[in-house]
């Protein structure tokens, strides 16, 4: 899990340094999704260990992860993170996770 976490966190750092309009952002998002979607349980454990700032940046890919996982477990993870960090505005991500389970 350490390599995995380090990879994702280093991508988050890269993402933080980019200008909001930088086209490279999409590539970073795709890489993060590719790593996290491999194993839902690992992804959930990883997200639960993240701090608020990293989660803020990772929340940009929550919709993509929701459509990959389409699961109650991932939705529950988002709900717990929202409770833990009420300042993170995750309502849309949670809505999307619910919708993706219904599709």
PLM region spans:
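Amphipathic alpha-helical scaffolding segments comprising HEAT/armadillo-like alpha-solenoid repeats
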Residues: 1-11, 37-49, 71-82
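Short terminal alpha-helical segments
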Residues: 1-33
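Solenoid-like repeat scaffolds
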Residues: 15-18, 48-54, 68, 83-88
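Residues in soluble alpha-helical coiled-coils and helical-bundle/repeat scaffolds
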Residues: 20, 34-37, 52, 70
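Structural detector for internal amphipathic alpha-helices that build alpha-solenoid repeat scaffolds
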Residues: 26-36, 59-69, 91-103
């Amino acid at each position: 899990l350490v390599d995995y976490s380090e990879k994702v966190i280093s991508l988050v750092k890269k993402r933080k340094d980019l200008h909001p309009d930088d086209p490279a952002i999409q590539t970073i998002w795709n890489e993060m999704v590719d790593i996290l979607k491999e194993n839902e349980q690992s992804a959930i454990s990883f997200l639960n260990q993240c701090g608020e700032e990293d989660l803020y940046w990772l929340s940009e890919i929550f919709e993509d992860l929701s459509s990959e996982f389409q699961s109650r477990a991932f939705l529950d993870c988002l709900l717990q993170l929202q409770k833990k960090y009420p300042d993170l505005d995750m309502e849309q991500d949670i809505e999307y996770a619910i919708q993706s389970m219904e599709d």
